[in-house]
Amino acid sequence: MNILWHIRFYPPGSNCGSDWYAHELNKFFVSVGHSVKVMLSENDAPYNLDGVEVIAKPVNWGDPISWADVIFTHLDFTPNTCQMVQRKPIVWIMHNTFDYSTVRRNKDRVKVVYNSEAAKEQIWYPNESFVLPPPVDIDYYRVTPGDYITLINLNEAKGAEVFYKLAELMPNQKFLGVKGSYGKQIVKKLPNVEILETQRDIREVYKRTRILLMPSAYESWGRTATEAMASGIPVICTDTFGLRENCGDAGIYCDRKDIQKWVEMIEKLQGKKEYIAASKKARKRAEQLRPDTKLEQFDKFIHHITKKEYDTNRNKSIS
């Protein structure tokens, strides 16, 4: 099957969770024999990443569209994709619960992929759909944790102010802040805070992390929580609908405004017994989130919407 993506950004140039969602899914598609191309609006130099062909901006947009059996898109490229593609099925990956009227208006052509069951409940579309949480290769992200308390993406919505307040209140703890790929990054100089630039390989961050903080105002899933749990790193987070479904009972939930509660949970994890217990729960939850079965089911869904025959004897590995 020929699969085409029409989106704005793609790894390794982008480290956004939505773009890594696309790449992890594409790695699976390649592993089971599909051909995958990614068409970026501003890309002038083609490259190949894990078997995924990222093509240069075409002179004629119709050529890659004619090649494809199905076209994937997400976020702000959705209206443009629907306008460009008239006779092929479109798969729209839903990364948030903001309403996309273009998707509703094209309910017969556009298939919806929700990133969580909770998101589907919050904003239901009449389109044919599938629920596929962000696929994370658990083995790839498994590292030996370090000794920092970490926040990834230092913007206000991700909880940068909470992060710095905790660092001020806990001067004997080491904090690690990692700049994100989007949003205004809030950088403050504190003696116990180290700031890193945006990382191309986020595993280097997890190698230095003992506790991951996610004091987010909004998360429809929260991919970094899954990545951290793969290494048994406890996640202290806000109780958003996405993080609750993602972390399950392994998450340590705090109200974003209750700073003292965050301090208490961090202090609790300083105990060896408490940390080991939380780490085991995190690893267990990560194992439950292995995407292999869901990806196989999703591939059958794609065969269904493209009216292609599904081969039950092919390779089923995701990597």
Q: What are these model-derived regions, one by one?
A:
Residues 17, 257, 273-303, 310-314, ...:
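A charged, aromatic-enriched C-terminal amphipathic alpha-helix characteristic of glycosyltransferases
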Residues 204-209:
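Short alpha-helical donor nucleotide-sugar binding micro-motif in glycosyltransferases
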